[in-house]
Amino acid sequence: YCCSTAGEMQLNDTGLILEIVDRVVANHSIDESRIYLTGWSNGCSLSQKLANDHSEVFAAVACMSYYLLDDPRPDYSPIPIMEIHGLEDQIILYSNDAIHLPNLDAQKHGAIQNLLQWAEMNGCEGKSPDSNSPSVFYSVQSFTNCANGTEVSLVTLYAADHNPYEESYDVFPGNGGTVDTNGIAWAFLSRFSKAIEP
């Protein structure tokens, strides 16, 4: 969607995901009120784009290591958003004062700015998070009083690079088992469902 081959070839990744959702709904017995988005790196940015563009479809987002690169859509309706990001990320920098990818759009903001942008989009109360839950290896900053009963959260991993997961993948080391990021994401997502119109 945003970078590398898909971006260069202008592939319709959002259309593909929506088609997959439509086929799964048509062919399987699923709870349509609990269709969630998640992804890592470009997949996180795509998850946030889908939330922005098609908020009527998805119940919540919890993704890892990237930001929303688009402007808010006028027809966006608030849904819960969580982004999980390693403080030591050298690919998509936490602060994004600079970036190692040739994508100028990604230099607009970092993890904190992404949190604040979603808080504004979700009509959250206050200019700063009203919840801060620090622990030894990570912290969770959240806006909890938002439109549609939503929340917006940023999980900051103190000792993680671009890969926030426990296990290493390819050339990206994991967090060494210090933080169960999958568990954090699922605990967030599973709290939310969406009212489905008949």
Regions flagged by a language model, labelled:
Residues 1-9, 102-103, 166-177:
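Acidic/histidine-rich helix-loop elements
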Residues 25-27, 32-79, 90:
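Primarily recognizes the serine-hydrolase "nucleophile elbow" in alpha/beta-hydrolase
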Residues 18, 48-52, 186:
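Short, hydrophobic alpha-helix immediately C-terminal to the catalytic nucleophile
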Residues 79, 116-198:
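Alpha/beta-hydrolase-fold serine-hydrolase catalytic core, especially in secreted/extracellular enzymes
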Residues 83-85, 89:
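Short beta-strand/loop motif that positions the catalytic acidic residue
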Residues 89-92, 162-164:
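Acidic catalytic loop of the alpha/beta-hydrolase fold
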Residues 7-15, 41, 52, 105-109, ...:
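Soluble non-cytosolic domains of exported or imported proteins
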